[in-house]
């Protein structure tokens, strides 16, 4: 009887394990078949997916406990899992980067077939694979950048003095690892960008002597936190380096609980959500608001609009509409990302920094630069609507997003050399004329916030949390 019960238990366990993974298969990522992706699709998909990137110091792949062993647990959560067995750099760092990017392309291109939400695809890297994952998270184009990152005891710094020497040498090359410019470029704490770098979870052990957490994982966490991005840090008392999903790790169960809770805290946008891109300067970015990813105006706009919308912040501090300004917005990664986002609605709020004398000396070009942005977003508006044809135009399906053109909010103080008179007398009239010319909706934030000097921080320029809320309310009303 006991033997029967024992055998039944084993059978049930086997059935349970099998049920978690519905399908396993391998795909080639490179023409020579040396780069491959092992795919684990869950029985009951949640729509979420994770691309796994094993460690190994860029000299080998540790793809068992830092790869395949995670599949059962992830599939049990309904998460599709894809382990990328990337090619080693051998002096060419673009090889492993390209392999992981190709894995992301395949996952997102196959999303419908594999029951995946293409906007909910994360990356999970270990050690040197953590470094590679952080490179993908900070530097790769929007189309192949993850929606969230999980970094196990990651190599972050490429400075051999504070990191894993051989990871630095193998990734940058025997000469490259001595180049201060390359070291700085690929020490990925330097590449973190507000709003553009995805939320991250960093996992390490306090006694890791191979990849010191203070000069690696914590540096990435600090950069994320300082940028106002979502980030969590889990440091366990012991475990050294390389524990991964190994059951021998003393805190294995706690790790799974922590990771599971973190994953639940990262909301996934609906596939059919209306996409709203917030383009702008530091006022959009949320300068002066701690944790601006949560409390800046785009985040508050998301809260007002609800989960039927997907609002993304593409604000960059100090940027100008003017292409000859000191920091032109259209030179930024954020601008490329905003276009790649393929928004349904675009909120443009630029012009404040253009009012500075050093920038407004090129004010005669403000109109043409604003028109350039509008036409890039809406190619169908390359030719302004002619009188008498507005009704016919309105009946046609627009070849791009709805554009909301915001005037700058009032500059209550002349901080940062910003000139409110230039804003009111020169910039706003141009915006109004362009909006009328192209049939765009204009939101006059300057007029609507003229009496809100109590809703900005001490510099008199940037809205505080209350000011961001008012902006969000005004813009939400225009969107709805």
Swiss-Prot record:
Recorded GO MF terms: acetylxylan esterase activity
In short, the EC number is 3.1.1.72
Which InterPro entries does the protein's record reference?
A: AB_hydrolase_fold, AxeA1, BD-FAE-like_dom, GDXG_lipolytic_enzyme, SGNH_hydro, SGNH_hydro_sf
What do we know about what induces or represses this protein's expression?
Answer: Constitutively expressed.
Q: Which domain of life is it from?
A: Bacteria
Its function?
A: Involved in degradation of plant cell wall polysaccharides. Is an acetyl esterase with broad substrate specificity, releasing acetic acid from acetylated xylo-oligosaccharides and acetylated xylan as well as xylose-tetraacetate, 4-O-methylumbelliferyl acetate, glucose-pentaacetate, and cephalosporin C. Appears to have greater activity on oligosaccharides than on polymeric substrates. Is also able to release acetic acid from xylo-oligosaccharides with 4-O-methylglucuronic acid side groups proximally located to O-acetyl esters.
**Designated name of the protein:** Acetylxylan esterase
**Taxonomic lineage of the native organism:** Bacteria, Pseudomonadati, Bacteroidota, Bacteroidia, Bacteroidales
